[in-house]
Swiss-Prot record:
Residues 591-615 are annotated as: Disordered. Belongs to the WD repeat WDR48 family. It comes from Drosophila ananassae (Fruit fly). The keyword Transcription does not apply. It comes from the Eukaryota. This is WD repeat-containing protein 48 homolog. InterPro entries: G-protein_beta_WD-40_rep, WD40/YVTN_repeat-like_dom_sf, WD40_repeat_CS, WD40_repeat_dom_sf, WD40_rpt, WDR48, WDR48/Bun107.
Length: 667
């Protein structure tokens, strides 16, 4: 017996968020699973965009959307309705199993027992028991009545474990009375347990590839399986063997649906076909339809005259089922058996487009995306908004047009797995505090022309995402307005923010606007990593990144005897005009007119006291900097020169020379 608790061990963490609309009424990626509540006509769909949506299938209107159920942050792989439609259980690639109030659409509790993707669920209606399984090779049994009674104070639940699986589990099935549970895995075999005793009773061999879908007969005597090997097999558990192999698909069988009398199989395949087959006589089969993409799941409509189907695409379609009629009178007076016409599209729930391509622009603030409908969009990562809808334009041309010759370090990564842009901030391979820029470049709308402020993109964004969070242990006198936000901008309050282990499990998910809540604030205190609280709560400034470089005279200098080569260190965002000022003031000992800001020998704070009336030209108009035989733009910063011009792993090297209209000896 294992015990689940909500506390988490402290591990390396990352923060991610999704740039999206406040309400996403359409699936933005494939749909993995369906559940129909025949009592009220509600269809529940589990999306690869991490959202469960509810649809009204009784209306003939195109607007079937009822609500979204959001708390996962990765593919939702399977769902089951239980308790006569009052509750719903979901399984996700975020490694969690969640319990939902199906009527109101909110998450009641989260189970974190699995250690990897949770791929499949099975439900025993008569016992109100659910089983979950996934890539961690584990199967857990849950009492639904216990799960639905969990509260913030009563948050511990006991589960039974079915052991023995040696590979990742992709399919799971149970009969209504809960006497048999079957799993299918990449072992290519079926394992059978008695969930009442948690004892394994047998394993069945026959498939040659992963077992992707399973159905158990109500009496628990038969199992039908579909495999990536393209076959459907019928198994007799009493005889412990395969009694029939059905070949009706050209590629893997990913979804199965049985008729109530367990005589007809409806199968959906990677070959995009949905086929009805008589189990006792597989030659009696009928193509229902050819879908637009590989079929992921199937489910009956209310009166079972049609079947809802989902695919890799985001649309959900209902197809009319053909019926097998054994009582058709032929011309000679005998009886023939034939299929009635099916395959008509009865309804369609349209989905949205999934983002398939993404380019981070050189300024490391904007990304350009292209979706499955060839629509190109520009997103502002810093402000967490869609900036511009460009339409069906040339994607590569737009990237080229908008990319500036500027280098800013990577400070985030983009994940497109859900079909929407998920931005990931961390401290591992990519440091989210790496991007220091001038406020003029990063936030031109906030520029004060009398100052030269440097801003850190990662710091500003974290402060905006957690603007509403006030830790409980902060003294009241410290909680003034200056402690909240970044002072420049806010991000959309509907933005989901996710704290997760690096390369692993989700620990906390909340919306920006909800961070002020008591439970959310407590959860943030328990889960937010130190590098987040340092900048958001303690208001610490991230460290500047520095670049070493050499400075030497150009061969064309009028004083060739000056050959000294100086090694300097400066903040990487220092502009080359500061290097020009340093050359004039410290190397050539000339009077300068600073272009603003400060610089000293290390170029951190350069400020010349010499500002005579006879030297009014700024340094960049009197000094040329060269790198790799290229004249350097004084507006470039050091990191941009190193990336685009120097292009070497060795220390950056500048050569300087005076322009023709300036003689440093003529002071």
């Amino acid at each position: 017996m294992l015990t689940h608790k909500t506390c988490q061990a402290r591990k390396k963490m990352q923060v991610s968020f999704v740039i999206r609309d406040a309400e996403e009424k359409q699936h933005r990626n494939g749909v993995n699973a369906l559940q129909l509540d025949a009592n009220n006509g509600k269809l529940y769909s589990a999306g690869r965009d991490a959202i469960i949506r509810v649809w009204n299938t009784r209306t003939e209107s195109n607007e079937k959307y009822i609500q979204s159920m959001e708390h996962h942050n990765d593919w939702v792989n399977d769902i089951v309705l239980c308790c006569n439609g009052r509750n719903l259980i979901s399984a996700s690639c975020d490694t969690t199993v969640k319990v939902w109030n199906a009527q109101k659409g909110f998450c009641m509790s989260t189970l974190r027992t699995h250690r990897d993707y949770v791929q499949a669920l099975a439900y025993a209606k008569d016992r109100e028991q659910v089983a979950s399984a996934g890539l961690d090779k584990a199967i857990f049994l849950w009492d639904v009545n216990t799960l639905t009674a969990l509260t913030a104070s009563n948050n511990t639940v006991t589960t039974s474990s079915l052991t023995g699986s040696k590979d990742s589990i992709y399919s799971l099935a149970m009969n209504p009375s809960g006497t048999v549970i079957v799993s299918g895995s990449t072992e290519n075999i079926l394992r059978i347990w008695d969930p009442r005793t948690c004892m394994r009773s047998m394993k069945l061999r026959g498939h040659t590839e992963n077992v992707r879908c399973l159905v158990v007969s109500p009496d628990g005597n038969q199992v039908v399986s579909g495999s990536s090997d393209g076959t459907i097999k019928v198994w007799n558990l009493g005889q412990q063997r395969c009694v029939q192999t059905i070949h009706v698909h050209k590629e893997g069988v990913w979804s199965l649906l049985m008729s109530e009398n367990f005589q007809y199989i409806i199968s959906g395949s990677r070959d995009r076909n949905i086929i009805v087959t008589e189990m006792r006589n597989p030659s009696n089969k009928m193509l229902v339809c050819e879908e637009q993409a590989p079929v992921l799941s199937l489910g009956y409509n209310i009166d079972k005259t049609g079947v809802w189907a989902t695919t890799w695409n985001s649309d959900i379609r209902c197809w009319k089922l053909p019926m097998y009629d054994r009582c058709t009178l032929n011309s000679s007076g005998g009886l023939d058996a034939q299929w009635t016409q099916g395959g008509t599209e009865l309804a369609c729930i349209k989905g949205g487009a999934a983002i398939k391509e993404c380019t981070v622009l050189n300024d490391k603030r904007y990304i350009i995306t292209k979706d499955s409908q060839d629509q190109v969009v520009v997103y502002d990562v810093l402000r967490v908004v869609k900036k511009e809808q460009l339409g069906a334009v040339d994607y590569e041309a737009e990237v080229k047009k908008r990319n500036k010759q500027v280098y800013i370090p990577n400070w985030f990564t983009v994940d497109l797995k859900t079909g929407m842009p998920t931005i990931v901030l961390g401290q591992e391979e990519v440091d989210c505090f790496a991007a220091w820029v001038s406020i003029e470049a990063g936030l031109p709308e906030c520029v004060d022309p009398t100052t030269e402020i440097k801003i850190n993109y990662g710091k500003l964004l974290l402060e905006a995402l957690l603007e509403h969070w006030t830790p409980h242990n902060m003294p009241p006198n410290d909680m003034d307005q200056d402690m909240h936000g970044n002072g420049y901008f806010q991000v959309p309050k509907h933005t989901p923010v996710i704290f997760s282990e690096v390369g692993g499990r989700t620990v906390c998910r909340l919306l920006v606007r909800d961070a002020a809540g008591d439970s959310e604030s407590t959860l943030l205190q328990e889960t937010a990593p130190q590098w987040v609280t340092d900048v958001v709560i303690e208001k610490n400034i991230p460290k500047f990144l520095k670049i070493p470089f050499f400075l030497q005279p150009h061969p064309q200098m009028t004083k060739p005897e000056r050959t000294k080569k100086d090694r300097l260190v400066a903040n990487e965002f220092i502009q080359c005009r500061k290097v020009c000022e340093h050359v004039l003031e410290k190397v050539l000992n000339a009077e300068t007119t600073p272009s603003g800001g400060n610089a000293n020998n290390s170029l951190q704070n350069s400020q010349s006291d010499a500002n005579s009336e006879g030297s009014q030209l700024p340094a960049e108009e009197r000094i040329e900097l060269w790198c790799n035989d290229v004249v350097v733009d004084p507006n470039m910063d050091l990191r941009t020169v190193r990336h685009f011009i120097w292009k070497q792993s060795t220390d950056l090297t500048f050569q300087y020379k005076t322009k023709q209209n300036f003689n440093y000896d003529g002071k």
